[in-house]
C-alpha cells in the first residue's frame, strides 16, 4: 500500500510505499478523520501522530466520509457531496464510492501529520515550500502580522514578484478585501442617511394616507346618514299621506 503523507506546516507532501503488512495494521479498521500514532512505520516516525484524511482502492474509487462500511456502495450524489462534481445545474448521479473504514484493499491511503515527532523526515518536515499567494482579506493580513486596528494594512500586503527577461523587475499586489477606508465609511453613512430618509418619508406618507382615509370614511358616513334620513323622511311622508287619504274617505 502507498501512503500519501502531507505536512500542512511546511506545505510538503510525500508518497511512500509500504510492503510490510505489520506496519500497516495500525491503520486497519480505523475510520476517516481518526488520529493514529505513526510509530509503527519506522524509527524515524517515532512521536508522529497522523490523521486519516481519505484514500483510494485498487480500482481507483475514493473513500467517502460517513459511509460506515469496508466495501463499495453506489450512492446518488448531487452538488455539495464529496466524490462528485456536477456537470450541469441540478444534476444528480449514482456513483460508486468506498466506505470510510480502512482495510487491506486500498491502494493509496492519505495521511496528514497532526503532531511532529522527534526526528525530521527528509522531503517532508525539513524543507518548506513557500506559499504562492499571501492573504487578501484585511483581517487575515492583520492576523498574520499581528497588527492592531490602527496599523495600515496596505504596507504589509504580500507582493508577488513578476520577473521577465529583458524587462524591469516589478511586483504585483492583490486588492485588499474588507478594507475600511474613508470612502467605505462615507458610503456607509450615506446608506444609513438614505435609510432614515426612506423611513421618514414612509411615515409621512402613511400618516397622510391615514388622514385621507379618515376623511373619506367620515364623508361616506355622513352620506350614508343623509340617505338614511332622506329615506326616513320619505317613509314618514308616505305614512302621513296615506293617513290623510284614509281619513277623507
Swiss-Prot record:
Post-translational modification ADP-ribosyl glutamic acid, affected residues: 35
Signal peptide start-end: none
Intracellular or extracellular location(s): Cytoplasm; Nucleus, Nucleolus
Gene Ontology process terms (BP): cellular response to ethanol; cytoplasmic translation; glucose homeostasis; negative regulation of bicellular tight junction assembly; positive regulation of apoptotic process; positive regulation of cell population proliferation; response to insulin; ribosomal small subunit assembly
PTM (free text): Ribosomal protein S6 is the major substrate of protein kinases in eukaryote ribosomes. The phosphorylation is stimulated by growth factors, tumor promoting agents, and mitogens. It is dephosphorylated at growth arrest. Phosphorylated at Ser-235 and Ser-236 by RPS6KA1 and RPS6KA3; phosphorylation at these sites facilitates the assembly of the pre-initiation complex. Mono-ADP-ribosylation at Glu-35 by PARP16 inhibits polysome assembly and mRNA loading, thereby inhibiting protein translation.
Function: Component of the 40S small ribosomal subunit. Plays an important role in controlling cell growth and proliferation through the selective translation of particular classes of mRNA. Part of the small subunit (SSU) processome, first precursor of the small eukaryotic ribosomal subunit.
Family under the similarity heading: Belongs to the eukaryotic ribosomal protein eS6 family.
Protein name: Small ribosomal subunit protein eS6
Gene name tied to this protein: RPS6
Amino acid at each position: 500500500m502507498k501512503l500519501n503523507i502531507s505536512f500542512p506546516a511546511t506545505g510538503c507532501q510525500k508518497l511512500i510505499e509500504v510492503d510490510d503488512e505489520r506496519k500497516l495494521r495500525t491503520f486497519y479498521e480505523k475510520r476517516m478523520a481518526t488520529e493514529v500514532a505513526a510509530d509503527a512505520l519506522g524509527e524515524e516516525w517515532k512521536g508522529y501522530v497522523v490523521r486519516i484524511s481519505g484514500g483510494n482502492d485498487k480500482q481507483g474509487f475514493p473513500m467517502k466520509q460517513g459511509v460506515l462500511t469496508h466495501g463499495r456502495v453506489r450512492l446518488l450524489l448531487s452538488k455539495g457531496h464529496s466524490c462528485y462534481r456536477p456537470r450541469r445545474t441540478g444534476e444528480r448521479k449514482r456513483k460508486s464510492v468506498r466506505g470510510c473504514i480502512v482495510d487491506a484493499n486500498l491502494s493509496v491511503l492519505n495521511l496528514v501529520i497532526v503532531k511532529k515527532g522527534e526526528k525530521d523526515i527528509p522531503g517532508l518536515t525539513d524543507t518548506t515550500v513557500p506559499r504562492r499567494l499571501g492573504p487578501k482579506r484585511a483581517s487575515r493580513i492583520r492576523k498574520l502580522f499581528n497588527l492592531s486596528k490602527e496599523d495600515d494594512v496596505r504596507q504589509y500586503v504580500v507582493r508577488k514578484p513578476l520577473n521577465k527577461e529583458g524587462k524591469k523587475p516589478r511586483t504585483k499586489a492583490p486588492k485588499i478585501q474588507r478594507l475600511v477606508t474613508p470612502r467605505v465609511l462615507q458610503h456607509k453613512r450615506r446608506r444609513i442617511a438614505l435609510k432614515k430618509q426612506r423611513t421618514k418619508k414612509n411615515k409621512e406618507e402613511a400618516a397622510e394616507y391615514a388622514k385621507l382615509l379618515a376623511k373619506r370614511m367620515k364623508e361616506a358616513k355622513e352620506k350614508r346618514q343623509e340617505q338614511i334620513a332622506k329615506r326616513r323622511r320619505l317613509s314618514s311622508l308616505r305614512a302621513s299621506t296615506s293617513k290623510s287619504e284614509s281619513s277623507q274617505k
